[in-house]
C-alpha cells in the first residue's frame, strides 16, 4: 500500500459489540440543503445510540464555505450557489462526477481523537487509490490527499507539482462526526476555477479520469467500501 503508516496509528475500529456501519447510496443529485438536513437528523439519532452511517452522494454544481473560508478565495461568486457550512476547512466545489461520502460515526464508540479521525479518512482515500494503482499521499501542512504530477512543470520553489484529488472537511457534535470527504472521479475540473480550492493557490486539482483511469463511479464505490472497512470496520447495507 502507498504511503500507509502503521495500522495502529490510523485505526478507528469500533469497540466490541458495536453494530456495523450502515452504507447507503443516494439516488440522483442531492440538493445541498437536503444533505445537511439529513445529516443533522442522522447525527441526532446516532448521538442517541442509533447506528452509524456512511452516506454516498453526488451534488449538483455548488460551492461550500468551511469555517476558515476567506471571502477573497471565492473568485466567481455568481457562478454556482454558495453554501456556508459548519465543517472545517475553506472553499470547495461539489458536483456531478465527484463522490461525496458523508461519514457519521460516534467516536465515543471508537477513539475520541479528531486528528486520528481525519488521518483515518485520508487513509481510506489512499487505500482506495492504491487499489487502482494511484499513489495518493498526505501532507502534514495540507489536509486532503494529493498526487504528484511529474509531467507538469516544477513549482516556483523547484519542487514537483502536486494536485489534490480528495478534500476533507468534518464537524463534530457530541463526538459524532458529520460531513466527510469528496473524491474526484470525473467532475468538470473547470468548475474549481470559481474558487481557490481549500485556500491553496500553489497546487492544482485532478481526478481519476484526468489521471488516465477510465473508471466508473460504481468501480470506485466498491474500492472505497473495502478501504473504509479496513480502517473503520464492518459495514452493512447496499452493495
Curated annotation (Swiss-Prot):
Sites marked Lowers pKa of active site Cys: 164
E.C. number(s) listed in UniProt: 2.3.1.181
GO BP: protein modification process
Residues binding substrate, per UniProt: 87-94, 167-169, 180-182
Keyword presence, Transferase: yes
Keyword Cytoplasm: yes
Pfam families to which the protein is assigned, alphabetical: LplA-B_cat
PROSITE patterns in the record: BPL_LPL_CATALYTIC, LIPB
Subcellular location: Cytoplasm
InterPro entries, per database record: aa-tRNA-synth_II/BPL/LPL, BPL_LPL_catalytic, Octanoyltransferase, Octanoyltransferase_CS
Domain BPL/LPL catalytic, chain residue ranges per copy: 48-236
Pathway given in the UniProt record: Protein modification; protein lipoylation via endogenous pathway; protein N(6)-(lipoyl)lysine from octanoyl-[acyl-carrier-protein]: step 1/2
Active site: 198
One term under GO cellular component: cytoplasm
Gene Ontology MF annotations: lipoyl(octanoyl) transferase activity
Domain of life per record: Bacteria
Reaction(s) the record says it catalyses: octanoyl-[ACP] + L-lysyl-[protein] = N(6)-octanoyl-L-lysyl-[protein] + holo-[ACP] + H(+)
Keywords carried by this UniProt record: Acyltransferase, Cytoplasm, Transferase
Family: Belongs to the LipB family.
Function of the protein: Catalyzes the transfer of endogenously produced octanoic acid from octanoyl-acyl-carrier-protein onto the lipoyl domains of lipoate-dependent enzymes. Lipoyl-ACP can also act as a substrate although octanoyl-ACP is likely to be the physiological substrate.
More about this protein: In the reaction, the free carboxyl group of octanoic acid is attached via an amide linkage to the epsilon-amino group of a specific lysine residue of lipoyl domains of lipoate-dependent enzymes.
The protein, known as: Octanoyltransferase
Biological classification of the source: Bacteria, Pseudomonadati, Pseudomonadota, Alphaproteobacteria, Hyphomicrobiales
Gene name of this polypeptide: lipB
